[in-house]
Amino acid sequence: MVLIRVLANLLILQLSYAQKSSELVVGGHPCNINEHRFLVLVYSDGIQCGGTLINKEWMLTAAHCDGKKMKLQFGLHSKNVPNKDKQTRVPKKKYFFPCSKNFTKWDKDIMLIRLNHPVNNSTHIAPLSLPSKPPSQDTVCNIMGWGTISPTKEIYPDVPHCANINIVDHAVCRAFYPGLLEKSKTLCAGILEGGKDTCQGDSGGPLICNGQIQGIVSVGGDPCAEPRVPALYTKVFDHLDWIKSIIAGNTAATCPL
């Protein structure tokens, strides 16, 4: 089964399409408190997602994490014992690619958010660089998030978990995900032997390769971390011109909400 990797409460989720959700980092380890200064915890209408700060006023997450009441937390490590420099924001504007929220499981699952107020860089807050080039096959990349750490049970950690996975040949994902186009704007990433994966609650978080955000957690298998079932990540490099154009003030090609 294919799952969008979000965490919902007992309310019925009203997304652009309805589908059972799933995604936290399985098979990882607690992240070091200083290795995720760009990581954002997103709460929206009962959904938990991740996100990535890309400059003091802008962040990226998945389009399917959208909701009416979004709360964005920066500089967070322990949810139970927040850092003193934690900052909370809400969206000023949300941008979808390209001028539509009608994304599919394989396409357009990206949202660019302008914050209501810029965040201040601090000990636990700093942006992550946008990609200078796309990652090649077999590149080792890092995943992280507060998602479930069990592939079959909802066990959510107090601190984000991290794991290393690899960029996988897109043909492997096309074999598992029916309808995935050869030129889809996605990255296929995981461990073919299984055991490490994003999972429920990790949606919208970053896939980091060589110190740059290369992917956004989008869709994965159910259960998570199964052998030969990599997850799909929205490919940030393929949306780079759009991202830079919006940040520069050219909103003609999209619709702010």
Swiss-Prot record:
- Give the subcellular location: Secreted
* Entry-listed glycosylation sites: N102, N120, N121
Q: Which residues form the propeptide?
A: 19-24
Ranges where the Peptidase S1 domain occurs: 25-248
What Pfam families does the record point to? Trypsin
Q: What is the disulfide pattern of this chain?
A: C31-C162, C49-C65, C141-C209, C173-C188, C199-C224
* GO cellular component entries: extracellular region; secretory granule
Does the UniProt entry include the keyword Disulfide bond? Answer: yes
Q: What class of enzyme is it?
A: hydrolase
Q: Which domain of life is it from?
A: Eukaryota
Give the active-site positions.
H64 (charge relay system), D109 (charge relay system), S203 (charge relay system)
- Residues making up the signal peptide according to the UniProt record: 1-18
**Principal location class:** secreted
Q: Which SMART domains does the annotation name?
A: Tryp_SPc
For the keyword Disulfide bond, the answer is yes
Write the record's keywords in alphabetical order, separated by commas: Disulfide bond, Glycoprotein, Hemostasis impairing toxin, Hydrolase, Protease, Secreted, Serine protease, Signal, Toxin, Zymogen
Family in the record = Belongs to the peptidase S1 family. Snake venom subfamily.
| PANTHER family xref list | KALLIKREIN-1, KALLIKREIN-RELATED
Q: What does this protein do?
A: Snake venom serine protease that may act in the hemostasis system of the prey.
Query: What name does this protein carry?
Result: Snake venom serine protease KN1
> From which source organism is this entry?
Trimeresurus stejnegeri (Chinese green tree viper)
